[in-house]
Design a protein with these regions (language model features):
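Membrane-interface helix-loop junction between the first two transmembrane segments
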Residues: 5-25
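Membrane-helix interface/capping segments
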Residues: 15, 45-54, 86-93
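Membrane-embedded catalytic scaffold of the fatty acid hydroxylase/desaturase
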Residues: 31-41, 64-189
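Juxtamembrane/interfacial segments at transmembrane-helix boundaries in multi-pass membrane proteins
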Residues: 47-70
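Alpha-helical transmembrane segments in multi-pass membrane proteins
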Residues: 1, 21-38
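Helix-boundary and loop/linker segments of multi-pass membrane transporters
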Residues: 17-23, 58-65, 99-100
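Central hydrophobic cores of alpha-helical transmembrane segments in multi-pass inner-membrane proteins
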Residues: 1-11, 46, 73-79
Length: 189
């Protein structure tokens, strides 16, 4: 909430407001619903992941090694990419994800505009990480970092970031992802 207020204040300061009250309230409400449904996701997927991790994992990665954390972060992002891509290209996934793209504005509150039904399918994409032995607490940590990273890219106040744009999701290229022009729909994930 502090980040949203800071972005709002900055937008007012430079005379480039990216917030509409009704749109922001809708985004915040949807975000709170997702938070509530997240409890169900943690319970259900946590149980499934635990069973996979303890009974079916091919080996156990050592969480004391930095390479485990780097691997887990990159692999999590890889599977997130495929989940996100499927969320655009498959209708059953799109039915859940479309709410995120319905905001009239593009700001940090848009990042919170998430459906409460996404957890029904998103957890499936991360099963391979548990099968190859990524520890649960490493997954929770890198998943949280990924979520934090996804938040800041929903701002119109951050300019292009040079070479970084070529390799990572940034506010600039994610704005294109949220564009509604036919030319840009489903072009970058």
């Amino acid at each position: 909430l502090v980040a949203l207020l800071l972005e709002l204040a900055y937008g007012k300061l430079i005379n480039k407001n990216t917030y509409k009250l009704n749109d922001t309230i809708s985004s915040l409400f949807m975000g709170s619903l997702r938070g509530t449904s997240g409890i169900l996701k943690i319970g259900f997927s946590g149980y499934v992941y635990y069973q996979i991790e303890t009974h079916f994992a091919l080996w156990r990665m050592d969480s004391n090694l930095w390479i485990t954390w780097i691997f887990a972060f990159v692999a999590y992002d890889f599977f997130y990419y495929w989940f996100h891509r499927f969320s655009h290209e498959r209708q059953i996934f799109w039915a859940s994800h479309v709410a995120h793209h319905q905001s009239e504005e593009y700001n940090l509150s848009t990042a919170l505009r998430q459906t409460g039904t996404g957890f029904f399918i998103s957890w499936i994409f991360y099963i391979p990480l548990f099968l190859i032995g990524v520890p649960s607490y490493v997954m929770v940590s890198v998943g949280t970092l990924n979520l934090i990273y996804q938040f800041w890219v929903h701002s119109r106040h951050i300019p292009k970031l040079g070479w970084y744009e070529l390799f990572f999701v940034t506010p600039s290229n994610h704005r294109v992802h949220h564009a509604q022009n036919d030319l840009y729909i489903d072009k970058n994930y």
